[in-house]
């Protein structure tokens, strides 16, 4: 599936300290967990975790992504969109982006990840520094049509290693909340 993610006006990505809405504690725990989401999903799924690539390729990055990466608006970058699945169900929609120039400088080949988790790579390489998490109500227009629901929580953070910046956004889909609720029973 190849498509360009449309721009959405005025998306407010906020750190924990600036959230002005009441969010229940289990949701906050997922949104601001600084550990590996891949590992947490693997535990929740009792090792029935998988990654399904949806799109990988070069395209102009969204304005909010360019701003977060500190690059010019409309810059081209590598975009990777996947579903993180538990028991075959899409639990998380993830979009990872990096500018072309950063990838050329940073020596990381995202094109060869395939169905492997980017999170495994980021959390196994101690040289990557994770910047603070930010959250938003993720725009429905940015989601694949089969996952397009209103008012889904998304989070993102920037990972940095020797001049290579990657921006990773993760959107928590309804099936994840159901699985997490069942685990807590």
Swiss-Prot record:
SUPFAM superfamilies associated with the record: Chorismate lyase-like
Gene3D superfamilies: Chorismate lyase-like
Pathway involvement of the protein, from the record: Cofactor biosynthesis; ubiquinone biosynthesis
Subcellular location: Cytoplasm
Any one of the GO BP annotations: ubiquinone biosynthetic process
EC number: 4.1.3.40
InterPro entries listed in its UniProt record: Chorismate--pyruvate_lyase, Chorismate_lyase_/UTRA_dom_sf
Enzyme superclass (EC): lyase
Main localization category: cytoplasm
One GO molecular-function entry: chorismate lyase activity
Keywords, ordered alphabetically: Cytoplasm, Lyase, Pyruvate, Ubiquinone biosynthesis
Pfam families reported in the protein's UniProt record: Chor_lyase (PF04345)
Catalysed transformations (reactions): chorismate = 4-hydroxybenzoate + pyruvate
Binding site for substrate: 80, 118, 170
GO cellular component: cytosol
Recorded family membership: Belongs to the UbiC family.
Function comment: Removes the pyruvyl group from chorismate, with concomitant aromatization of the ring, to provide 4-hydroxybenzoate (4HB) for the ubiquinone pathway.
Protein name (record): Probable chorismate pyruvate-lyase
Organism, scientific name: Pseudomonas putida (strain ATCC 47054 / DSM 6125 / CFBP 8728 / NCIMB 11950 / KT2440)
């Amino acid at each position: 599936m190849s498509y360009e993610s449309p721009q959405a006006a005025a998306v407010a990505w906020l750190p924990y300290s600036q959230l002005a809405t009441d969010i229940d504690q289990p949701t906050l725990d997922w949104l601001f967990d600084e550990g590996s989401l891949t590992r947490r999903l693997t535990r929740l799924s009792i090792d029935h975790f998988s990654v399904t690539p949806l799109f990988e390729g070069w395209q102009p990055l969204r304005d909010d992504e360019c701003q977060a990466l500190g690059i010019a608006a409309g810059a081209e970058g590598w975009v990777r969109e996947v579903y993180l699945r538990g028991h075959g169900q899409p639990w998380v929609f993830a979009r990872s982006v990096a500018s072309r120039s950063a990838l050329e400088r940073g020596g990381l080949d995202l094109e060869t990840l395939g169905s492997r988790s980017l999170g495994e790579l980021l959390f196994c390489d101690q040289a990557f520094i994770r910047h603070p998490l930010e959250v938003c109500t993720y725009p429905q227009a940015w989601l694949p049509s089969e996952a397009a629901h209103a008012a889904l929580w998304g989070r993102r953070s920037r990972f940095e290693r020797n001049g290579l910046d990657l921006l990773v956004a993760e959107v928590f889909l309804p099936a994840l909340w159901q699985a997490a609720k069942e685990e807590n029973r």
